[in-house]
A protein has these predicted regions:
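Conserved Q-loop
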Residues: 3-12, 87, 121, 185
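Short coil-to-helix "N-cap" segments within the ABC nucleotide-binding domain's helical subdomain
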Residues: 8-38, 46-50, 139-150
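Short catalytic/signature loops enriched in Gly
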Residues: 43-46, 139-227
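Conserved ABC ATPase signature
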Residues: 51-56, 60
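A short, proline-enriched helix->beta-strand linker immediately N-terminal to the Walker B motif
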Residues: 71-75
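P-loop NTP-binding/switch modules centered on Walker-like glycine-rich loops
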Residues: 78-82, 86-168
Length: 227
């Protein structure tokens, strides 16, 4: 919702994208805006183009943003936390919409999210990042079945499991390092519980490279490889 300008109508904002990038006039831009709103599942798009952002729901606002992002038929759509602050039902609708649009338009989606459930549902391949670095990369099924990096294991271990009884959820101790002054070695070392005292000495001073431990499965950790 906050990405939309509160003082301009929805139609103006969608049409502006088309005017800037495709040099469409106002009339043609509004006509295309109606088509785009219809494509992303907004009811009565002919009326909604005249609405202001505060007159639509959070889910509809998210659909408007997706329409604006797809207006120029990009080859790649970068979706940064597209379901944040939406209730579970609306989240599912937005994810279904993105999946449907991907199949219809052929647009690739780079999905940025902290929600492992969304990743499991949407992704083909996953890149796990910690403190500004890639620590693991693998096909989604491989990552969930066989996580290798201690941080990835910690993320998956913190997810509640239906039917599993435990007093508290697993947590990763410590906090993220200062990115303005990162540690010289492995950035996860201060929080890592996987390395022993001997290995920790190396982890403190040497940042491990990203290595391919299995076909298509990359990890940044001294626990793996012949390093």
């Amino acid at each position: 919702m906050t990405c939309l300008n509160p003082v301009f109508k929805i139609g103006d904002q969608v049409a502006e994208v088309l005017n800037i990038h495709q040099s469409l006039g106002k009339e043609a831009g509004w006509k295309r805006a109606i088509e785009l709103l219809k494509m992303v599942g907004i009811p009565e798009p002919q009326k909604r183009v005249h609405s202001y952002p505060h007159e639509i729901s959070g889910g509809q606002a998210q659909r408007v943003m997706i329409a604006m992002a797809l207006a120029c038929a990009p080859e790649l759509l970068i979706a940064d936390e597209p379901t944040t602050a939406l209730d579970v039902t609306i989240q599912a609708q937005i994810l279904d919409l993105m999946r449907d649009l991907r199949e219809k338009t052929g647009t690739s989606i780079l999905l940025i999210t902290h929600d492992m459930g969304v990743i499991a549902e949407m992704a083909d391949r996953v890149v796990v990042m910690y403190a500004g670095q890639i620590v693991e990369e693998a096909p989604v099924k491989t990552l969930f079945a066989k996580p290798m990096h201690p941080y990835t294991k910690g993320l998956l271990g913190s997810i509640p499991v239906l039917g599993r009884v435990r007093e508290t959820l697993d947590v990763i101790p410590g906090s993220v390092p200062n990115l303005l002054n990162p540690p010289p070695g492995c950035r996860f070392e201060p929080r890592c519980q996987a390395c022993d005292d001997i290995m920790r000495k190396r982890c403190k001073v040497e940042n491990p490279p990203l290595i391919e431990v299995e076909p298509g499965h990359w990890v940044r950790c001294w626990l793996y490889g012949n390093n």
